[in-house]
Each structure stands twice: as structure tokens, then as C-alpha cells.
Amino acid sequence: MITKTKIMMAPRKLKIARKSRFWAVNSLPGSHKKDSSIPLLIALRDYLKLGDKEREITRILTNSLVMVDGKVVKERRRGIGFMDTLTVSGNDYLVSYDRKGKLVILPKPGETKGLKLLRVKGKTYVKGGRIQISFHDGSTMVTDRKDIKNGDSVLVKIPKKEIVDVLKFAPGNRVFITGGSHVGEIATIKSIEIKSSSGENMVHMNEGFSTVSSYVFVMGSPKYTFSMPEAIAE
């Protein structure tokens, strides 16, 4: 298994100085896709500036000072991605996108402490007639709820992933754009155009633009809106 790559070849979504080092570690498979995740080593060293040497970051991890979504993580190659909560020495950070499509790590608003939004990517029926839901971060959940649809966002408590609310992929709801020319923007769904072909459904916004449904991450309804860091919500 290839554990590192030349930093010039690292995923373009990483917001790092590409001339500062020669090598960059690769994210482990299993959570977010490689091109949409930040290995913890890079997150702690290059983003949060908690150490300059790999051994300094390894020491922080070994001492159980780092959590992802409320669970202690010691693996330096563990990848974190959009909507993950990174906790270091009690301080919470949220992984998001800036207006250039780069992954950023910003202080997490206090009102969202202990909460996470998960976008539904797929559903399958399992034994007993229950439903297994797969999410954007690679995680899954088995539930009896049949009202949860693809494209919806599920608000959960972390780390146990107890469902708090379901934000529907529907007109009138607020969304965060995760790709395309409007990446990093927050908008409101005006209408959803269902394609009869194999092409992606189009989502039209009140703000006057449209994008494919896979770039739309529901973050708010008339009753609740998940607060994003100020630098992203502007």
C-alpha cells in the first residue's frame, strides 16, 4: 500500500503550501474519498500548525488529544472531510469548503457542539425489514425510519449517531454547495428538476443559479439551520 505521495501530486482540495515539503501522506481508505479528505498529520501540522515535525504530531495523537466526531483517533493517516468535527485538546473545529473549493478547518460554532450533519447517499433493506443508510462520509446507519430519502441530511448526536432531526432535500430549504462554480456558497432551493435520463437531477436556487444534486448538501429548514463557521457563511 502506498502511504505517501509527492506533495505536488497531493489532492488539489488540500489547502497546503506545496513548495514547503517534498512528501505528503495519503489518507487511509474507509471514510471520505482520498481526493476529498485531509490526513490527520496534515490537518494538525499544516492546517492547525500544532507542530512542524511528524514526530511532534505523532506525540499529540499518541497522547489521545485528538478526536474525530467524538472518538479518539491515534492514526496519523486517518482522513477527515466535509462536516467532520475535529477536536484537539477540547477545542472543536469543523471541516468545510472555501469559495475556491479547498478544504478548510475552522472553529466550530458552539451551538453545534456534539452535532453532525450527514448527507444520505444510498439506502438498502437489511434483515428484519430495516433500512441501512449510507452517508457522504462513508459511514452507515441501520434504522426503522422510512421517511429518510436520498439527498436528505440527517442531524445526529456524536459520537453515538442518535438521530435528532431530518432536513429534507426539498424546495425552501437552505443548502451548502460542495462543488462546481458556486462551491462554498449557501443558497435556498427554489425547485428540483428530475432528469428522466441517466444524467444528474438539477437543483435551481433562489439566488439565480443551478447545480447538480450531488453538489447540494442540505443544512437548514424553516425550523432549524446548522450553523457554519463565519468565514464560510459570509
UniProtKB/Swiss-Prot annotation:
Organism phylogeny: Archaea, Methanobacteriati, Thermoplasmatota, Thermoplasmata, Thermoplasmatales
GO molecular function, one term: rRNA binding
SUPFAM superfamilies for the chain: Alpha-L RNA-binding motif
Stated name of the protein: Small ribosomal subunit protein eS4
Keywords recorded for this protein, A-Z: Ribonucleoprotein, Ribosomal protein, RNA-binding, rRNA-binding
Biological process annotations from GO: translation
Source organism superkingdom: Archaea
Gene this chain is encoded by: rps4e
Domain S4 RNA-binding intervals: 38-99
One cellular component (GO) term of this entry: cytosolic small ribosomal subunit
Family: Belongs to the eukaryotic ribosomal protein eS4 family.
This protein's record includes keyword ATP-binding: no
Pfam families assigned: Ribosomal_S4e
Cystine pairings recorded for this chain: none
